[in-house]
Amino acid sequence: YYEDWKHVVFQGKVAKVLNKYVVLDQTAFYPTSGGQLHDIGFIEGMYGKDEVVDIFKQGSVIVHVLKETPTCKVGEDVKGFIDFTRRKQLAQHHSATHIVGAAARIVLGEHINQASAKKTVEKAHIDLTHYDMISEEKLKEIEDKANWLIQQKVPIQLKFYPRTEAEQTFGMGIYQGGAVPGKELRIVNITGYDVQCCGGTHLLNTGDAEAIKILKANKVQDGIVRVTFVAGDAARAQQKGEQNVLEETAKLLQCKKTQVPARAQELFELWKQAVKKKKQPTSLELKATEEFLGSEKDMLVKVCEIYKTTPEHIVKTTERFLSELKETHESEKK
């Protein structure tokens, strides 16, 4: 996996078996490390197929954790199969972490460094060194610049260097997120934009990240801002989810998607007047037709501001406002 994230089928020999733990003489399974989750998959031998549910590193030894008691025996030749979809998503999130960091440096300044990071299948985050909270406008600029870097299909060079040579060639900025042990360092170089030592599974060019969508930013401590994002398939799923939220809300408000923010504002004002202030409006009909000119993400942000909620609660909040408004109106008529 150091050279090619697509290396998901390999052959090896069983070196040790202890309960559900198996060690092979060589493996392509990635262990949880560097803020990145482990691979999963199967080890297949002459006696059956064993499901691998966890991978960890004990010293220099990579240990495979099986779901059940292993069928493989010490000395047996086996074949390993790694879950390709999971590996791809984790590689996309890991390389996207470097891409987002590079984009943030372009937008916010050269003081930006990675303090730490985490990459899971569902999402990833990068903790950036920055003196202030990042505004929504700057987040949008960072997202746009990250996707621009994807469109450029910048080569990502993965190479091991002796520590001294790496430091002399690339400078001490390679140590982002803390010092790395060992006489040799694996350098991940997004040519011209970001260089750091890293041991994770990485793409071979930025284009393979496909898309990056920033979800939020929050301050975790003084001088550290956490940016949470998704990439690749996870980014497309997030975008699809946002589209579904807007479509469902538009149906509830009986309007076009672009009119949702205006209708949501109108509904909120009616609800506040009737339910909170106990003043019944003359009509419950929503008439606002003003069209929102921003992106779907900006539309969701606007509706969240109006409702004072989060995107996943927009539909339920709309349903609640409509229901409570109707109930209050009907009780007043009685």
Which sequence ranges carry the predicted segments?
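Conserved nucleotide-binding/hydrolysis modules and their immediate coupling elements
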Residues: Y1-F81, T85
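Active/ligand-binding-proximal structured segments within catalytic/core domains
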Residues: A28-I43, K73-L128, D222-I224
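Extended active-site and interfacial segments that coordinate phosphate-rich ligands
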Residues: F29-V63, S95, I99, T201-N218, ...
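Ordered, soluble secondary-structure elements with a strong preference for glycine-centered loop motifs
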Residues: P31-H38, L90-S95, D132-K140, G199, ...
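A generic structural motif
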Residues: F84-K88, H130-I134, N218, A231-A235
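Terminal appendage regions of diverse proteins
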Residues: H111, V121, G207-E210, L215-K334
